[in-house]
């Protein structure tokens, strides 16, 4: 065998080895992601006495699992002054490979406290929200305040007009939630039309636009 042929064979072997390593690395990454998704379990918190521990505004540093992708949670109460006014509460954290959050707080206020809180929320500089994740104009409840991000989701407050305020949030990335969110929140607490499932139309639209 000539030296030239030996060199050529060596190059072919090297290229093949690199290709195999790339395939193995890709398969390894897919395997890690699959294992992460399969083994990660949602953290479900219903302990209202620890309410502030699960809110981003309780931390000075963004280096915390409760940073919530920088979303503004100031729509929610800074603290719970009257635990007896809490009708329902849940905060869910799930991180198979990217952190996502789902929460709701239902408060039954006195007429005086309701009026004050509703006024605070109506003064909040609400953002546009219609069209993100197929959300339509809210009709189920009156929308008092909303902070919406076209990528990271929603933080908002709703009212039934009878001294009850429902604070809720769905915070995530990559245009979908891996969490089966309908298992953890009453559907009427979601904004009308909300769809963050893995094959939601909004995700398809945004991914197509990013590929152009």
Locate each region found by the language model.
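Intrinsically disordered, low-complexity repeat and linker tracts
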Residues: 1, 42-45, 209-212
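N-terminal Sec-pathway targeting helices
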Residues: 1-26
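Residue-identity detector for threonine
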Residues: 2-3, 26, 39, 52, ...
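Intrinsically disordered, low-complexity regulatory segments
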Residues: 9-12, 26-36, 191-194
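Surface-exposed polar/charged interaction patches
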Residues: 17-21, 54, 124
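N-terminal export/targeting and maturation segments
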Residues: 26-113
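Extracytoplasmic electrostatic interaction patches
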Residues: 117-212
């Amino acid at each position: 065998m000539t030296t030239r042929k030996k060199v050529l064979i060596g190059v072919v072997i090297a290229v093949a080895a690199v290709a195999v390593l790339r395939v193995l690395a890709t398969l390894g990454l897919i395997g890690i992601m699959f294992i992460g998704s399969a083994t990660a379990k949602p953290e479900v918190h219903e302990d209202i006495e620890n309410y502030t521990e699960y809110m981003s505004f309780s931390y000075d540093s963004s280096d915390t699992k409760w940073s919530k992708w920088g979303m503004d949670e100031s729509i929610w109460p800074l603290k719970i002054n009257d635990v007896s006014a809490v009708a329902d509460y849940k905060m869910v954290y799930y991180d198979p490979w990217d952190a996502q959050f789902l929460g709701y707080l239902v408060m039954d206020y006195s007429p005086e406290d309701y009026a004050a809180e509703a006024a605070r929320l109506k003064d909040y500089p609400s953002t546009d929200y219609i069209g993100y994740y197929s959300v339509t104009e809210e009709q189920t409840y009156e929308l008092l305040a909303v902070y919406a991000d076209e990528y990271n989701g929603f933080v908002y407050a709703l009212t039934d007009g009878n001294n009850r305020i429902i604070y809720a949030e769905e915070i995530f990335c990559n245009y979908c939630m891996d969490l089966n969110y309908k298992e953890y929140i009453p559907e009427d607490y979601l904004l009308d039309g909300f769809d963050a499932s893995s094959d939601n139309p909004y995700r398809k639209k945004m991914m197509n636009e990013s590929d152009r």
